[in-house]
Amino acid sequence: MMFRGFLRWCAARPEYREMTDRDAGKAAAIVENLPSNTRRTDALEAAQVPGWWAGVEQLSNRTASAYLRALLLTGARREELAALTWANVDFQWRKLTLADKVETTRTIPLSPYMAQMLAALPKAGPFVFASTGKAGRITDTRASHAKALQSAAIVGLTIHGLRRSFSLLGEAAGAPAGAIAQVMGHKPSAT
């Protein structure tokens, strides 16, 4: 839960440690008034991918279509991919450099399909997934995603569920869990 996560973050910082009661988030008065701490499990099953893919390809917004497919193909977080600039796409050496959520970057492979898909996008500014909106880049594709889900008769798949799908489908295909985690930007595990 975000509140408990924030308390743990504060407790880990020397400048906030003395002001923080790490167990405050476990108090009954707080726990009773916050939503349950359940883990989301939405992800595409292998058999659902063709229908979802076809639904996404039919979207009239070509940028949203490419963005949604790229989320599934890379396992990237929404904002990492939305903020991708042309300067961070290396078509020659087939790699993408993503700015991740902890202010570092990671480089991932750019598949031939993905390279072709990105090259077909209009270069209307610095962002790969450009938009005419205030941000200059794609910001919310939930409506487009909902259309694709409806056409594929898939219920309950969130945008973040595409990230989970990347991981689960990669494991099902036999990719090593460590390689999947590295591409997704997860911290290395000691296990």
Feature map (PLM): residue ranges:
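Active-site/catalytic core of tyrosine-dependent DNA strand-transfer enzymes
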Residues: A43-P50, W93, P109-V155
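Short, polar N-cap/turn motifs at the start of nucleic acid-interacting alpha helices
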Residues: N88-L96, G156, A175-T191
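Helix N-cap/coil-helix junction residues
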Residues: E15-Y16, A76, K123, I154, ...
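Basic, Lys/Arg- and aromatic-enriched nucleic-acid-binding interface segment
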Residues: M1, A12-R78, A82-A83, Q92-W93, ...
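Non-catalytic DNA-binding core/recognition domains of DNA-processing enzymes
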Residues: M1-C10, L110
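DNA-binding alpha-helical recognition surfaces that contact promoter or target DNA
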Residues: G5, A83, A143, L169, ...
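Hydrophobic recognition helices of helix-based DNA-binding modules
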Residues: F6-A11, L121, G170, G174
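C-terminal catalytic core of tyrosine-transesterase DNA break-rejoin enzymes
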Residues: R69, L73-E80, G161-K187
